[in-house]
């Protein structure tokens, strides 16, 4: 991939969500070359028929917000979009786009001096974008992400890794004593423990070995297709994986989405996955009821509301199917350490006031992108009075502020719920000496 290139601009505003990029009714089209024709069909109907390979999108804040729908990044990649320049990106779209081979750059000035049809020049090494005689600085691209784009996306990158012998990093988790070291936010503690790093800071890229992976039935067909494309005949640790049939059940079996049902069974048989839950309930509820997502650990799933498990102090975040496939094969997953917002819930919940009311008020205060790529960390008397189900409810909706995760402190209720000694998890707490 060239480090300097030019392309025609397609200009968009703020809060362009994944439903705008590809409407939900088009998201199940099995042929990506057919699906790509419907990109932006409700906003820019001409896009699908006139976009050219190498074109560049320029947008405002929170581009790619809403659902974790990986198809949004996929259709842009299949349409040949080379780069997206925006003021900010929704966190899951950010990952999905890089994994689809699209270069993302952050810049908050170019939007005011360009229009659709203008030609913009990108210089990766100089960290600049230029249009209409003006040049602006852009954020640096982490080396690991640039390499994914240069290799043609995560699938091709993973193929090359397998061909080279799938060499894994030697990651040794931190001891309990090291986890208790002062001066870190909850998310920093969990990430540094898993990554075996004695120190992490916001913006750092860390390689982790997640403790649990969850796949639900909407994405079983795409995941199976991706695994076959990569050529994987085994996964790193089948015992760390669960498949939940819930989004399409029971109609999937009855009439309309039988392929998703069968694909899940084929995934389980092919890769030795034993933790199967067919029509037993909502995937995010099963994750904590089955004790798959534990305090102080890392869980990830093919769904945006994976943040739910943060109610137990579990670092959890949604990813796309390409990234899930790569992570299942390698056992590894990168994360950018987020900044944190400490939210102190003082007082007590009055009769008739539910945890849903609390998070809705918080969302109203900080708005849809107020937690963009941040860890919302809850503490205070009202937080500790909440039941585990109430905490899961709050954490579930942290996503709606663009948050990377929503974490509650692990306390006596958490220990009782999981049947764990409190002293094993009490380090998952807000540290007043942390930079939050």
Show where each model-derived region lies:
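Fe-S-dependent hydro-lyases/dehydratases of central metabolism
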Residues: 1-436
């Amino acid at each position: 991939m060239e480090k300097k290139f030019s392309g025609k601009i397609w200009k968009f505003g703020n809060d362009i969500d994944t439903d705008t990029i590809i409407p939900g009714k088009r998201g199940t089209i099995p042929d990506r070359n057919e699906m790509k024709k419907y990109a932006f069909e409700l906003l820019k109907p001409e896009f699908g028929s006139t976009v050219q390979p190498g074109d560049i999108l320029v947008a405002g804040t929170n581009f790619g917000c809403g659902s974790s729908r990986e198809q949004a990044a996929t259709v842009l990649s299949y349409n040949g979009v080379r780069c997206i320049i925006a003021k900010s990106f929704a966190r899951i779209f950010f990952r999905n786009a890089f994994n689809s081979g699209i270069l993302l750059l952050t810049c908050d000035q170019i939007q005011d001096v360009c229009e659709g049809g203008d030609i913009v020049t990108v210089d990766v090494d100089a960290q600049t974008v230029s249009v209409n005689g003006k040049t602006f600085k852009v954020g640096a691209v982490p080396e690991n992400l640039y390499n994914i784009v240069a290799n043609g996306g995560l699938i091709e990158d993973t193929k090359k890794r397998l061909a080279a012998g799938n060499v894994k990093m030697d990651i040794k988790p931190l001891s309990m004593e090291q986890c208790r070291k002062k001066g870190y936010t909850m998310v920093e503690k969990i990430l540094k423990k898993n990554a075996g790093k004695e120190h992490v800071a916001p913006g750092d890229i860390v390689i982790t070995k997640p403790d649990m992976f969850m796949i639900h039935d909407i994405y079983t067909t795409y995941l199976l297709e991706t695994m076959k494309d990569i050529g994987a005949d085994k996964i790193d640790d089948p015992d760390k994986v669960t498949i939940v049939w819930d989004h399409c059940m029971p109609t999937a079996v009855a009439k309309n989405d039988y392929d998703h049902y069968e694909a899940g069974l084929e995934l389980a048989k092919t890769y030795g996955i034993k933790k199967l839950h067919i029509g037993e309930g909502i995937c995010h509820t099963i994750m904590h009821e089955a004790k798959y997502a534990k305090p102080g650990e890392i869980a990830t799933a093919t769904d945006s509301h994976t943040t739910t498990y943060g109610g137990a102090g579990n670092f959890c975040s949604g990813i796309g199917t390409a990234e899930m496939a790569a992570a299942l094969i390698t056992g590894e997953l990168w994360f950018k350490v987020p900044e944190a917002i400490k939210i102190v819930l003082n007082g007590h919940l009055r009769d008739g006031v539910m945890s849903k009311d609390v998070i809705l008020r918080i969302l109203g205060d900080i708005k849809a992108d107020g937690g963009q790529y941040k860890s919302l960390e809850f503490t205070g008397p009202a937080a500790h009075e909440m039941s585990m189900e109430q905490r899961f409810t709050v954490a579930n909706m942290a996503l709606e502020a663009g948050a990377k995760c929503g974490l509650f402190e692990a306390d006596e209720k958490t220990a009782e719920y999981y049947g764990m000694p409190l002293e094993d998890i009490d380090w998952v707490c807000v540290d007043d000496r942390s930079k939050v």
